[in-house]
Design a protein with these regions (language model features):
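Short hydrophobic alpha-helices and adjacent helix-cap/hinge residues
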Residues: 2-13, 18-21, 26-281
Length: 281
């Protein structure tokens, strides 16, 4: 497979569209009658269901929140724009794991049993589950910080295997500089105080970003205080445990934090603390 696409400056729906470049190539090769050329793929997209059965495509997201919803919508919309329409020449099976790892595993088994010819996975846990479920079905993923750190590819530069996609790694050093600058201008905060980080340590992508953020902060002589939140219910306590000790919050791309965005905003506003986050959900 081709190298992974670093799309940290794209919007989430654009990330899905970028990943589609690989997806269309896979779809063009699906089915006994399909060929690998762009012209043949376009012709195949115009065949009727009576001529060719719709190609089964699995779509899975870890949980429902704005960012992941946008990736799925962008992927499906771009497929349609390129002639691959659900219910016509493809059949999309969209599954939501509701944040449950066991459900993700079951979804992977479902896609394999249903002979999906392509799987689109949104989030790191989702692509990890799909990579465990199949070594042959092409898996295209987005909302993943590092495919290599997630251990679903040999390396981000040369994935190999059946998994590829789009990275959403944020410009961490620039985010740190921005937070320090804002904290220095914010009343009742002091840039000499530590920076607070709340994240789900069981999410590989979140831990990967936090490690990088800590390393960047250490170079500037800035302390980082962390608190873990394994579920949305843990977020308020984790946030409150850092209030009064920090000059501001930084958050990595993290599905738990994204799902609790309203809570994060409320607590930070009440504490009059600036926030810099990798996710806009």
């Amino acid at each position: 497979m081709t190298s992974l696409h670093p799309a940290q400056h794209l919007t989430f729906s654009r990330r899905s569209a970028a990943a589609l470049a690989a997806a269309v190539l896979f779809l063009a090769g699906c089915g006994e009658e399909a060929k690998t050329t762009a012209a043949d793929a376009a012709a195949a997209s115009k065949t009727t269901p009576a001529q060719q059965a719709p190609i089964p495509v699995g779509v899975v997201q870890l949980v429902e929140h704005e960012a992941l919803d946008a990736t799925v919508k962008g992927f499906i919309d771009e497929l349609a724009a390129r002639g691959f329409k659900d219910g016509e020449n493809i059949r999309i099976d969209h599954q939501n794991a509701q944040g449950d790892q066991a459900t993700l595993a079951n979804i992977g088994t479902r896609f394999v049993s249903n002979k999906s010819q392509l799987i689109f996975a949104s989030s790191t846990p989702a692509v990890q589950a799909m990579a465990r479920a199949t070594k042959t079905i092409p898996v295209v993923a987005t909302a993943v910080t590092s495919f290599e750190a997630a251990k679903v590819v040999k390396s981000d530069a040369a994935p190999g295997g059946n998994v590829t996609g789009v990275s959403n790694l944020s410009p961490i050093t620039a985010q740190l500089d921005l937070l320090v600058e804002i904290a220095a201008l914010t009343p009742n905060t002091a840039k000499t105080k530590p920076i607070g980080v709340v994240f789900n340590p069981s999410e590989v992508n979140a831990q990967f970003q936090v490690d990088r953020f800590k390393a960047a902060a250490e170079k500037l002589g800035i302390e980082v205080l962390t608190a873990s939140a394994s579920s949305v219910n843990d977020v308020p306590q984790a946030l409150n445990s850092l209030k009064g000790k920090i000059c501001g919050f930084w958050f990595p791309t993290d599905n738990v934090i994204a799902s609790a965005a309203a809570t994060v905003a409320k607590v930070a506003a009440e504490a009059k603390l600036p926030v810099v986050a990798s996710d806009s959900a």
